[in-house]
Swiss-Prot record:
Coiled-coil portions: none
Name this protein carries in UniProt: Acetyl-coenzyme A carboxylase carboxyl transferase subunit beta
Any matching Pfam family: Carboxyl_trans
GO biological process: fatty acid biosynthetic process; malonyl-CoA biosynthetic process
Amino acid sequence: MNWITNYVRPRINSMLGRREVPENLWIKCPETGEMVFHKDLESNKWVIPASGYHMKMPAKARLADLFDNGEYESLPQPKVAQDPLKFRDSKKYSDRLRDSRLKTEQEDTILAGLGKVQGLKLVAVVHEFNFIGGSLGIAAGEAIVKAFERATSEKCPLVMFPASGGARMQEGILSLMQLPRTTVAVDLLKESGQPYVVVLTNPTTGGVTASYAMLGDIHLAEPGAEIGFAGKRVIEQTLREKLPEGFQTSEYLLEHGMVDMVVKRHDIPETLARVLKILTKKPVSAANDVTRGAIALAASA
């Protein structure tokens, strides 16, 4: 009886009372190693409170944070061919799509919304990096083109938030075709007289950098974002030279004239509203000298 009381019953109770604990409750800062509770990170817009390090922000959270009161119209996801090349590497492409959809609860990497930022109507397009590295494929390209068409028909600006490793290799030449398609969409918006502003986030690389990510009228960037075409390691191996400290970061690109402003995530909605009001010649309250100066330089370039 003692054996049952002292061992079996406590063992059963402990097994029944055990609860599954999610693995991602605590998130480590890549810069300092500090562990941050995930709810604290989410409430701070995915910025590490102590170090100010900007973590990757989910696309849905970014749209909700950008628009006034988190209210916006979600633009529909276009229906396209799934896995047209029947591609397979270490895993079927169709399986990668299924897993990414379960993970992100999105059909593909692009989310787009129409709403207001400080009262100014605009279309926002956001990459979800957790969907196959935010890569540009047929579905993403079509969603981007449709978003530009909607901005053109609504006669409002479009703001792009790229976060991507580049073209989606599992779709081959069909993926690469999205580069000229999105470039034409940018041109059509500009021909209609509407501004196109890009907020470069970490990372923005590959074919996305070679197309619509660097075609904005104004380029903002989040602090510490990696922005470039080829990766640093590939460039160093090709040139057989060590690259400068901070190469391909948003701060480096600002210093060398490739980016107009580096803006902290908390300040992005207000900065965007000021920039767009200046570009559309609407009244703007007390825009600081840095904002006006950056826009003037970009306009004269």
